[in-house]
Amino acid sequence: MDPERFGPKRAALTFDKDSGVAATAMSLADRSATHAARAGSMRAGWLRGSPDPRVEVVWRSGPYRVTELFFCPDEKTGRLVRRISLARSAAGASKVRLSTGVRERSIETEVAFRGRAAGPVIIEYRLVKQGVRSAVAVRLGTDPGGKNAAAAYWKDTAECRFSDPSLDRFFAAAKFQLRAAVSASGRLDGSIWQYNLEWVRDQAFIAMALAMSGQPGPARTILARLLRDFVSDEGATLDSSRLRPWEESELDQNGVLLFALESYLDWTGDLDLIRANWAKIEKAAAFPLRPQFRNVPSGLIVNRREFWERHEAHGIRMGMELAHQLFVIMGLRSAARLAGRLGRTGEAQDWTEAVMLLRKAMLKDKRFSLIDAGAFIKRRGIDGSVQREVRPDPGSSLPRQAPLFGPGRHLLDPDTSAALPIAWEFVDPAGRLAARTLASLEKLWDQDWKGGGYGRYNVTSEPDSPGPWPFASLFVARAALEAGDASKARRVLDWLGRVPGSRAASWFEFYGPRPVPPYPQVGIIPWTWAELIFLFVHHMLGVRPGESFLSVRPKLLPGIDHMTADLPLRDGRLELDVRRARRGQLPGFTCGSRKMPYHRYGLGLELPEKLERIAVRAIIP
């Protein structure tokens, strides 16, 4: 694909409208037959232990064993290398003809065996311009070797090991693929091959994950572009690559962007990005506080578009959405701290006061709080009544085979967005509110399907197909781990390891039948990779940097007794070694010559102005 131009699968530059990608297949011709990969004879996967992203494909045909290695050796140019090595069962001298190509362009070369091995043969694919459009050029090349520009880039990124091959692969693949999904200019499709559109929310979370995984460059590019191009002069944010009328504004996006900016700053120390873009940051913070967005009796934020983008046609009424209150409050809290770091005390005070009032109304208001029967609820109307169900517009173009149009009531709760205040510790994860909320979300596991996974919300109000959602399931996994239920987090990861796409660690938006049309076919969601990075770095390793303070609060999953990490942090590195205490072993933390007893709130360290390397050893229950 051209990274600067979104498109469906059929827009791939290697795709031919008649033959698909058949021309890219490789064949070997000897004196007796032509050999090629066949279904069932091929194994593909990430190359285990490689410091940079490499995919290995191994297949057999006749006497030949073929190993193909795919990788990108450059950071600044669009170049893919395909390294082909051949082996055979018999020794001796002989030759084969190797053929492959791209669309109408073919390549052939003669390969000589000396003994049982031959090669490697290097095929090089380059992204080139043909007028205003892009194309792929293919040629025979030379081996770039192991010390290339891309390898140097990946050497400086985060390294994490969890004593579990699946989780090690998930982390590495999430780190690799987040970078691959972002173009040089910062463009990023919300769902690869599916939507061909961009969202501030998704990209801000992805920028956070890039910073956590030691990739500040692309994180900065994304955030700078969002502030420049995706925040209007009034402070509204774009979703689906467009601005909407005020009633449809996805106000949580303003908060997520501000929250991501503070997280990026805490990880990188890059205050210049904040200073240079303060005018847009100020507008993004002020926008949700405009009078038209406020419920007069409570002060809470109102609109007619919910977190998952259902709106009036789906039966959503004007009201207060849980996730919108959450992220506006979290974002304003971040904006206030950013203002304080720039010496803008007036704005810091104003936004802090707004945070306190909104938080009090969200959690404590007897009529308007987003809590009912001791658990978080999704939505209230402007009169304070809980919006428990929806009735879709009978004249809408929504697909009639969806559960939303089935018989019976169409309920909004439970909704996995209710896990987010727990996952981000907006409320006490060990408290009764968190426990009751998480218990209510268990209705979404296997609600109308078999095999596991959480649906994004009550399936009876689903305008799409019933089925589990990977990134929504990770909301619950993160919240459960913070609440002390590590088995629920493990269950989600085990489920991700079973579903299609797990080998590549590239998951679809959801798993279920799709009404196509009117909806596009499902694609691969980059946000899922960000959620995995959050689970691994923020929750399991428990690394939470602040302005001048570092908190380390590690948590081990069932079946994992040891994990290590080497994480870039500002101008230095954080080295972390976490082990489960053996019988009779006293839990605690060691940092240099300091030894501290274990506490469930973890270890707190003051960050030096010039950070080089911090090494922490943790023995935890």
Regions found by a protein language model. Name each.
Residues 176-187, 226-235, 258, 299-309, ...:
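Active-site-adjacent bridging/hinge elements
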Residues 118-139, 190-192, 238-239, 244-255, ...:
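The feature captures the catalytic groove of carbohydrate-active enzymes
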Residues 152-275, 320, 413-426, 453-483, ...:
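Substrate-binding groove/exosite segments of carbohydrate-active enzymes
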Residues 344-386, 429-575, 579-583:
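Non-catalytic carbohydrate-binding regions of carbohydrate-active enzymes
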Residues 109, 240-246, 311-314, 318, ...:
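Short beta-alpha connecting loops at secondary-structure transitions
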Residues 160-168, 210-223, 264-282, 293-296, ...:
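Structural helix-adjacent loops and short alpha-helical linkers that scaffold large soluble proteins
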Residues 1-166, 482-485, 525, 542-621:
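Terminal accessory carbohydrate-recognition/targeting modules of carbohydrate-active enzymes
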Residues 169, 173, 201, 205, ...:
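Generic recognition of stable, solvent-exposed alpha-helical segments in well-folded globular domains
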